[in-house]
Amino acid sequence: AHDENMGALKYFYDDAPAPIICTRFTKHVIETQFNFNTLRIPLEFKVIPPTSALEIAGRKFHFFQTSHNAAYSFGVAIETSKGNIVYTSDFIVDYSVKIPAYIFDMKALSVLSERPTFLLMSESKGANHEGYCSPHHRVTPLIEKYFSNANKRIFIDCFWQNFFRISEIIDLCIENNKKIFFYNDFT
């Protein structure tokens, strides 16, 4: 849940109100964004776990957690008579992630694969490269040397909704006995 992915919500929700199906984390991001922009539109949320199933308008929707730099992101598969229509935003499969908010639910995806897939809509950047991609969501290997070498302050600019990266920075601060001060337009 990044604000650039939901920017249109404030423009059309009044004209086409419907429940916003999301995780608790995404609900918080949406509410924060609307409060920051002083938009007082009453929103209806349907909060779900990242891996779950729901019936909407007579169709079965299956949600499965993916790994992304936004916590509890998910893809969705919609059952149809011809097979599943599957949508995922950008994600990676990182088997080393131990934080529950960022674990790819391979088991849920495996269960979905037991039915035919009629249409797959997924990011494909880098699909033409063999092997594995680098976990681009990790910043620790790139900046930890600055923490161990710094005698004074370190300033870091980071996207406020990238909680994976923020948690890495907090961990580095704790490991290197650095004080933390957060600043953004909300503080």
List PLM regions with ranges.
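His/Asp/Glu-rich metal-coordinating catalytic cores
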Residues: H2-D185
